[in-house]
Amino acid sequence: MGFSQAIRLNLASFSSPSPCDYCLTRVVNHKQKSLVAFPSITRRKRHLLLSVQSVLHNTRPNINDNGSAESANVLFDKLFARTHRLERQTNQHSVYPDDDDLPYSNLGVLESDLEAALVALLKREEDLHDAERKLLSDKNKLNRAKEELEKREKTISEASLKHESLQEELKRANVELASQAREIEELKHKLRERDEERAALQSSLTLKEEELEKMRQEIANRSKEVSMAISEFESKSQLLSKANEVVKRQEGEIYALQRALEEKEEELEISKATKKLEQEKLRETEANLKKQTEEWLIAQDEVNKLKEETVKRLGEANETMEDFMKVKKLLTDVRFELISSREALVFSREQMEEKELLLEKQLEELEEQRKSVLSYMQSLRDAHTEVESERVKLRVVEAKNFALEREISVQKELLEDLREELQKEKPLLELAMHDISVIQDELYKKANAFQVSQNLLQEKESSLVEAKLEIQHLKSEQASLELLLQEKDEELAEARNKLGEVNQEVTELKALMISREDQLMEATEMLKEKDVHLHRIEGELGSSKLKVTEAEMVVERIAELTNRLLMSTTNGQNQNAMRINNEISIDSMQQPLEKPHDDYGMENKRLVMELSFTRENLRMKEMEVLAVQRALTFKDEEINVVMGRLEAKEQELKKLKEETINDSEDLKVLYALAQERVGEKTMGDLAIEMLQLEAANLEVEAATSALQKLAKMSTELLTQADMSIEADTTHTVMPERGYSEGSNECLGEVKTEVVRLWSLTEKLLENAGIVAGTSTCMEGVIL
């Protein structure tokens, strides 16, 4: 009914004046207006069509008229397609106002389609009304049929009650007859059932005994597997120890190779320094030669000028020929000296090139050695990785062993459960045997009871023997655990002693550092004295400069006097002769005066260079002293931190010892409980063994972790000390001999102390039975 009302409402909406007609009249009257209102009208129409279509799709089709429903759906699909086309056309032609007649031609088609759809809807409504009427008539028919069926069921139930009463009476009679027969047969069946129960119990006992034997065999096999795994573990541990020994040997070889490389590098550095000095000397000699060649060229120019003047005045300069010959001899001597100096330069250059070739060869050899050392280091790392993989395998084997032990314990628990079940089933068997013996013979019952009691006594005796053996085994294990605890206590005492030795060595290192500080103070005092000496040298240089200036003034005055004398001469010949004599005398006077002037200039330059060099050395030494002081403070802080860590480790060791003592007391308590429960065969023995093994494993792991932490601390100390020493050595730049020797001695002592610390840590590790991969750390420290 609700469906028909919805359709009627939709039809009423269509019977009202349609928006399409309104739109058409408005467009005819107002063609000059725009089509702005048309999309809203089409949207309303689309909404109405969508509502109609939703109603049509939600309705149920008629039973007899499927074709009409399908035709209505097809019509509405066509309507929707045309409305979509209209919307598209309106959207396309809304921009162009000239094409107004296109959508209105389509609106007429839409109206015809709507009318056809309304006709189809009316037909559909009539069909639905017919279907509702048919459904009501069918319901009435069904109700009538139900009433008739209920009446028939009542009659059938009454007849069945009568039939059941008759059957019950017959059954009672049969039951009475059968009960009498059953009482007779039950007595026979009791004997048979007792016999069958006895056979079933015997078969179940045999099966359970077989299961017990199988479980025992499995336990024996598992114990064999555990022993095999333990033997494999021991063999792998031996292989690991051998591999560690080989690694240590290889580390020693690497250390020797590194020492050789360091020595060669030092030699190369020394040779480079000598090469630099020689190059500087060559440069100085070349500069001197250039100066001499320039002077020689100047002298040659002067000689040529003199020759020209002498050619003009041959008649007057016979006396001066001897002087010119002397000058020529001097020039030839200078020429020979220049040639010899050039040859020496060429020879020194050849020597330098040969030395450079030798140095290049040595560098190539060093690079090859470095490559070999690097390859060797890689092989060592590979060996370490293999060792670690073997350790992982060993841990896996240990885990498997632990799992096998757990399985064995579980199987033993199952065995005990089976034994308890057997003990529970034994009284049932005894009752069955007792009943059978009452039926058959009392003598047979007594004999069976006697055999059962004998079997029980034998089982109890065997259980007592096994309990005694287990108690002895537990006692032996307790003694071994006590010995292990004593050994651990001794190892802890040794570790404490070694820690005391380490502390003593740290104090010794502090004393060494204090002595090195004193040496640094002495070096600073020496540097101050050198500063005073340098100031003195500067004063002397100033006085020498004053003397040079005074000499230059004297030479200038002599030159002025000679010029005045030359101007006073009137005669030409006498003037020329006097000029020649004066020039010769002036040259002879200036030559000895110029030589000391040049010597003073060279000395001044040399002294200035020495002053600058000494100042730079002093600055570098001051920087080195500051760096050493910083390094000392940093090392003191590191030593304090390490001491704090060592104290923390001692506290951890004390805690571990207390825990081991508590574990031993717990083991003793468990052992006492096991002694009290000797008469019963329980899982307490295995629990005690497992607890003992776990306690021992915990002790070993705690000791190994503590020792590994100590080793890490020592390696960190060593690496930090070595890095600080390397930083100090890199900042130093060729100090004087005394100071360099003192610093080298200090470095040697520090390295010896570091090696001692490392040897102590290795001894600790060897005493604890740990084979850790600390060789790589030592390699980094030595490098």
From Swiss-Prot:
May be a potential target for increasing starch granule size for indurstrial purposes. Modifying granule size in starch crops has an effect on both the ease of commercial starch preparation and on the final quality of various food and non-food products. Disulfide bonds: none annotated. Disruption phenotype: Displays wild-type growth rate and unchanged starch amounts and distribution in leaves. Starch synthesis, starch degradation rates and starch ultrastructure as in wild-type leaves. No change in starch-metabolizing enzymes activity, including SS1, SS3, branching enzymes, debranching enzymes or phosphorylases. No change in expression of SS4, PTST2 and PTST3. No effect on SS4 localization within chloroplasts. Larger chloroplast starch granules than wild-type. However, in most chloroplasts only one large starch granule is present, in contrast to many in wild-type. Signal peptide: none annotated. Keywords: Chloroplast, Coiled coil, Plastid, Starch biosynthesis, Transit peptide. Residues 1-27 form a transit peptide. It is found in: Plastid, Chloroplast. GO terms for cellular component: chloroplast. One of its GO terms (biological process) is regulation of starch biosynthetic process. Residues 128-309, 345-432, 457-512 form a coiled coil. It comes from the Eukaryota. PANTHER family: MYOSIN HEAVY CHAIN-RELATED PROTEIN (PTHR23160:SF19), SYNAPTONEMAL COMPLEX PROTEIN-RELATED (PTHR23160). Interacts with PTST2; the interaction is essential for the initiation of starch granules biosynthesis in leaf chloroplasts. Interacts with SS4; the interaction is essential for the initiation of starch granules biosynthesis in leaf chloroplasts. Required for the initiation of starch granules biosynthesis in leaf chloroplasts. Involved in determining starch granule number and size in chloroplasts. This is Protein involved in starch initiation 1.
